[in-house]
Amino acid sequence: MAVNLKGRSFLTLKDFTPAEIRYLLDLSHDLKAKKRAGILGDSLKGKNVVLLFEKTSTRTRCAFECGAAEEGAHVTFLTNSQMGKKESIEDTAKVLGRMYDGIEFRGFKQSTVEELAKHAGVPVWNGLTDADHPTQILADFLTIEEHAHKPLSEIKLVFTGDTRNNMSYALMYGAAKMGMHFVALGPDSLKPDEDILKEMQEYSKETGATIEFSSNVDEAVKGADVIYTDIWVSMGEDESLYPERVKLLTPYKVTREMMNKTGNKNTLFMHCLPSFHDEDTEVCKDMMDRLGLDIREVEDEVFRSKNSVVFDEAENRMHTIKAVMVATAGK
């Protein structure tokens, strides 16, 4: 059956069927190949796209701007909107929907991007919220397909760290939809929400996926095709929480030893970035000097190893985001 996503918003992979996700991945592969061959499209020619950011970003902004421009769109970047302050989300959505053909939102609440989509009248794309990160997952799956050389349904992906965060949940949603084996690996005190686990396990009955939580590193990583992690602390959080968080998560740091425990020399290391993997950032140095905390979630050796595909992931943000825009707002 043909897939038609015209006019659809892209808020979470939970809204999409496996066939629709497959369509977006296939389109991403195609657009990337054309880009490499110097062939740019015009699917968004004459279209206007607005990027609405509450949270800063390097990859998301660049991916949307480059992807839209390469398909012929004009892009506006907004960081100083009065949305939710002097103007309601509903009113902002209606105004932007009159001027733009697509709206990207990167911010805090999932309810905000959902409210925008409800009232805008044009496709709204989730560039990240505290609850989800669907565009990142498309890039991750594209990268896995490029490097693992087998179907997603045969992939075992282990996310290690704080398994309650948006990346863990977003990967879980995608894995459940695409029939993958997903393991959330971390301390029991940072276990995913039980309701979300049950919801994903229900999806899995239809797709053949396996979704599970483990606190045992040796058992969880055995046979893994992918080890994935994310930063442990987010700026803006209460610093008094950091020592306990780091203590809890240090056993789940991605090390060469952990990679070796997979028993698979080709296990991929993945990370959505930014990463604390060395001491070459002000934040990492500050945490070390001022609080005596090593917040590095991955060893530098692993981050820079041949198993690491983190910069392929970063590039693939553009190709997959371009695919989402073309599929939903293109001509």
Curated annotation (Swiss-Prot):
Highest taxon above the source species: Bacteria
Amino acids binding L-ornithine: 166, 230, 234-235
State its Enzyme Commission number(s).
2.1.3.3
User: One short Pfam family name for this protein?
Assistant: OTCace
Task: Give me any GO biological process, just one.
Answer: citrulline biosynthetic process
The record's catalysed reaction(s) read: carbamoyl phosphate + L-ornithine = L-citrulline + phosphate + H(+)
Say if the entry is tagged with keyword Cytoplasm. yes
The primary location reported for this protein is cytoplasm
Q: Which GO terms describe its molecular function?
A: amino acid binding; ornithine carbamoyltransferase activity
Task: State the InterPro entries in the record.
Answer: Asp/Orn_carbamoyltranf_P-bd (IPR006132), Asp/Orn_carbamoylTrfase (IPR006130), Asp/Orn_carbamoylTrfase_sf (IPR036901), Asp_carbamoyltransf_Asp/Orn-bd (IPR006131), Orn/put_carbamltrans (IPR002292), OTCase_ArgI (IPR024904)
Q: Which residues bind carbamoyl phosphate?
A: 57-60, 82, 106, 133-136, 272-273, 317
| Protein keywords | Arginine metabolism, Cytoplasm, Transferase
Give its localization: Cytoplasm
List, alphabetically, the HAMAP family matched: OTCase
Q: Which family does it belong to?
A: Belongs to the aspartate/ornithine carbamoyltransferase superfamily. OTCase family.
Job of this protein: Reversibly catalyzes the transfer of the carbamoyl group from carbamoyl phosphate (CP) to the N(epsilon) atom of ornithine (ORN) to produce L-citrulline.
Protein name, UniProt field = Ornithine carbamoyltransferase
Q: Organism source for this protein?
A: Clostridium perfringens (strain SM101 / Type A)
